Amino acid sequence: MDKSSKFFFEDQKYNKERIVRVLGGNLALLKSKGILYEDSSGDLIFNYVGVISNGRNVIFILPKYCNRHLDEHSKRTLFNKLLKIFKKYSGLNKSRESDYFVSELDSDEVSDFMIADYLLNDFSLNGYYQKKFTEYEIDGEGIIDWSKTVNEITPVFSKGVPYYFSTYNEVVQKDEYHLIVKIHKWALSKYFNDFGVILGFTGLEFDKSCDGMKILDYADFFGSVINKEIVNTYVDRDVKLLKALKTAIDREENQFSKRPTLSLYGTKYFHRVWEEVCKTVFSHVNEYVKKISRPNWINFTDIEVNKEKKTLEPDIIKAFEYRSKEYFLILDAKYYNINFDGKKLEGNPGVEDITKQLLYDKALEKLSRGKTKHNAFLFPSSNSTNTFKVFGSVDFDFLDIAAVTLVYISAEQVYNLYLENKTFSTDDLFKFVSEINKSKKRHSVITSTLYGNMFLFTKRLSDKN
């Protein structure tokens, strides 16, 4: 990539000078958007997953759960997959202010990244913009233009009937040197250099003869030519391509202006993406949510009971049957980088999250009756080998409710399912349940052994005394 491109990680501290070198005068703008914040020590932390481009440099921010020791190829591969997820997610969900998924190619807020993705993908499917003109050949192979033939060619008459032994035929030619075709070639080269590798278009080949085109010197003129072409074009693909080229010219102008430029494609709330992915691949059944009781609001004056419109809403509820046994899953997708470091716990959900999840268990008690129930938090993992890895549990010892199981889910595997429009099979779900059961048994054995050893140690001390 010709542009300077760097990978960073969400929620990791970075030296301020390092970020300034890459993003220059855009720090204040990023802070105002809540994408970047400064901690008490002066380090900068990204609260964002996605792409940031300032015209000269491009940075890619990976999710906080990712392995910090990934090589460059692995980072690019992962980010390419995340971009596909963003496109699918934004197409299915209404974008919020915290998301930067604008896809309208003539919008001031559309990302350079989206322009590149459109231009390169469109070229791979349709080739260059085609500016056509019509010429006429006598006795050619094209469609006969009878009006021109009758007006300009003398017929031979036989018994009063005219016979045309020659005709004018239309021949449609492509103007490969038209200005818009040249602008298209320039834009393809520019955006391929900036984003081609990360977007996975490494094998794309095109004419680079217009790389040195002086866009800045004639930006207004080029823009007016494209605008005129848009007015006279009625093919949807051509109109969309022309708008993308016009935006590319405008961005080139802005890049060299004195005001800061910033292009974003991503989200400040990746947890919504993680929730959507998990909800989809686990085949969440929303009908169960509708059956959960709603709060009762009682007016003591006239003893009137009002039902709240909203109720508890777990992320994922899934019931399934396997080998004549029924199972009931209550799951919550948690985008946390949780870590047990000896006795130290980091990146864990709050008390409110635990309380809600235990309350879901209670609220779904009747619906899950007769089924084997499991309640779990789902955390993303960079481990691509194990689909599910149970690593702990959380509960309140004063509540008579089963603990919430803590499970790492392979992010790569669920991303693949999501992009392929697939879900976990019944076998997969049973494997999920089996992993929880095996982990609980191991924990029970370890706990029993620990308490047994403590008892023996205490007894020996007592006997000595």
Swiss-Prot record:
Gene Ontology BP term (one): DNA restriction-modification system
Phenotypic effect of disruption: Not essential; its disruption results in increased transformation by plasmid DNA carrying multiple BsuMI target sequences. Triple deletion ydiO-ydiP-ydjA leads to loss of susceptibility to MspJI, which only digests C-methylated DNA.
Signal peptide extent: none
Name of this protein: Type II restriction enzyme BsuMI component YdjA
A GO MF term: type II site-specific deoxyribonuclease activity
Induction statement: Constitutively expressed during exponential growth. Encoded in an operon with ydiR and ydiS.
Enzyme category, top tier: hydrolase
Reactions this protein catalyses: Endonucleolytic cleavage of DNA to give specific double-stranded fragments with terminal 5'-phosphates
Catalytic activity, EC: 3.1.21.4
Record keywords: Endonuclease, Hydrolase, Nuclease, Restriction system
Entries under Pfam families matching the protein: RE_LlaJI
Role according to the record: A P subtype restriction enzyme that recognizes the double-stranded sequence 5'-CTCGAG-3'; the cleavage site is unknown.
Subunit composition and interactions: BsuMI restriction activity requires YdiR, YdiS and YdjA.
